């Protein structure tokens, strides 16, 4: 589940594609460009709505004989749109709780939003509360702790910053092919640490 960072690409060079190619996983990319964790109304493009849509389908075959893992990556559109960190947290919590109730044995990994060049390197204030991208990263980590799921701080692992990020981003926001590969590998390593 995620936004355009995961959803803009659906081939082997996508982040889920990298994960599938380097492991025995069978990824299902449920990310949607322009989506957020924040839910404004039922049936919108938010994470809670995406989870409800997913749970309403026939997913019995997904976990047959396999370990089910949900990778969640939201936050950039919440920040860009100016949704509050509080509403972002509520959306993440609602989606994660629904997945936990439906699949209590599944592994859940929340991946933080990646470093960006736009919006003054994520330091521009897009709402009346002066919240910056780092606040959404911290909120994602807090939700992971509260829900007792795993968390990957993409910024800490990848070490993208103002000096090197242009080499990993295609448009100041979305990872390029190398960036997607590196993020996919980071997710694999994070899952390997928690999976038997």
Segments (PLM) and residue ranges:
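Generic structural signal for well-ordered alpha-helices
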Residues: 92-96, 137
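Short hydrophobic segments within beta-strands
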Residues: 1-2, 111
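A short helix->loop->beta-strand "cap" motif at the edges of active sites that frequently abuts
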Residues: 103-107
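Catalytic His-Asp segment of secreted/periplasmic serine-dependent ester chemistry enzymes
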Residues: 114-196
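Conserved SGNH/GDSL esterase-like catalytic core that processes O-acyl groups on lipids
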Residues: 5-93
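N-terminal cationic-hydrophobic initiation segments that often serve targeting/anchoring roles
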Residues: 20, 62, 96, 100-101, ...
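Structural beta-sheet core signal
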Residues: 72, 109-111
């Amino acid at each position: 589940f995620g936004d355009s960072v995961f959803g803009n690409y659906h081939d082997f060079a996508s982040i889920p594609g990298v994960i599938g190619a380097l492991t025995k996983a069978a990824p299902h990319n449920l990310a949607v460009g322009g989506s957020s964790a924040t839910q404004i109304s039922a049936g919108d493009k938010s994470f809670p709505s995406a989870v409800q849509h997913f749970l309403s389908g026939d997913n019995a075959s997904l976990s047959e004989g396999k370990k089910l893992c949900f990778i969640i990556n939201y936050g950039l559109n919440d920040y860009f749109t100016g949704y509050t960190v509080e509403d972002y947290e509520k959306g993440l919590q609602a989606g994660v709780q629904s997945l936990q109730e439906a699949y209590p044995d599944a592994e859940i990994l929340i991946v933080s939003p990646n470093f960006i060049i736009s919006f003054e390197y994520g330091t521009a204030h897009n709402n009346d509360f002066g919240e910056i991208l780092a606040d959404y990263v911290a909120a994602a980590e807090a939700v992971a702790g509260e829900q007792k799921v795993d968390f990957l701080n993409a910024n800490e692992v990848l070490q993208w910053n103002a000096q090197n990020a242009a080499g990993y981003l295609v448009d100041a926001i979305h990872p390029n092919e190398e960036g997607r590969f590196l993020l996919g590998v980071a997710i694999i390593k994070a899952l390997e640490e928690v999976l038997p």
